[in-house]
Amino acid sequence: KMPQSGYFFDALNRQQPIDEEKLDPMDNAADFGVLSAGDLDYYARSTRKFYEETDYGIYVTLPGMAFGDVALIPATWRKQTKGIRDIQEWYMSLIMRPDYIYKVFEKQCEIALKNVELMANAIGNYAQLVFVSGTDFGTQNSLFVGLDTYRSLFKPFQKAINDKIHELTDWKIFIHSCGAIYDLIPDLIDAGFDVLNPVQVSAKGMDAQNLKNEFGKDLVFWGGGVDTQKTLPFGTPDQVYKEVRDRKSVV
């Protein structure tokens, strides 16, 4: 729904009353499916076209591989929703219903691994980079979830997908996660991610020089050229230029 004075649509909370005895992980997992022949043909034709007709590097979004992305939890494309759809309820379920979340992710991963194989066959080396996750793990000052929760619920499935991609292709893998995720980065590297975006340098602990010193040999940092919360929208042109120049010196 778009507010009368707004410029974008708000996702309405359509959480149905939760009956713990009838709660079925497959209601959330139903959001994911194996790619169709038409989907694969589109990916194959598009990547080949850009590969043969341009000198651009090509990255492809692999659908259905972001575990717990709260932009997708409400399932705004569905007429009716089942399962856990309220974002606050979802985050609480990471602690209150971990078995439920695990089963959702387990089914999602099963489907995602099939899609990795299909996409690898469809586009091969026409792509150089793939986007698999836009799940934000950080707030301004800390992580959304504890490291133990990440390691038990998210990491096993992310690693399974990344390992399969690296096994079948030469693609590099990037994850998008805003926020203060410094403490999570070693686990992201261990899970097989090659590139981190957007590098929110305004968040706690996300100093560009320190990130490069600590993790630069294992991870590509894509972004972080300027503080997009303060300097870019509110700074003077000279302040923007200076910050970008300072950031370039880190590279």
In which residue ranges do the predicted regions lie?
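Low-complexity, serine/threonine/proline-enriched polar segments
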Residues: 4-7
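Active-site loop segments of alpha/beta catalytic cores
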Residues: 9-251
